Amino acid sequence: MAKQSGHSKEIWVYADWVELGGTTLMGTLKAELVRGREVFSFAYSKEWLEKGSELLLDPDLRLYGGPQYSREDKPNFGLFLDSSPDRWGRVLMERREALKARQENRKPRTLMESDYLMGVFDRYRMGGLRFKLSEDGPFLDNNDAMAAPPMASLRTLEAASLQLENKD
């Protein structure tokens, strides 16, 4: 079971690409809050290492057991930063948090790197990685009502752009 508290979060990382023949546990990413900033470590699962994959997915992650820590000059491993949203996606997530806070009559909380990573709607996520907060839990983010990015908004944008094209 994943541990999640005010000080640490354990994220189950799954690889999901055709060559694997299905979703495969790759390992666990741990985010620990240290002096107001998250420090990340990653440990490959025993199964992933036993598969004998020679694929180096991040130059800062070597294929061996045990925790490996992200470099101080990086907010996370590049592999996971690639799965996180860009600047605009982060703005959308901050707006979603503000809306949620208003609905729950509380102050918006400051989002951390792990919140951005886990906040991308699973079905819209780019790349071959998927994430859970427990081994038997759902892939996240799975909130259909507040998906980031909101696909309905993209359709509205498409319609507006088509109207502009037709005016010419």
Regions found by a protein language model. Name each.
Residues 1-168:
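Phosphate/dinucleotide-binding and metal-coordinating scaffold of catalytic cores
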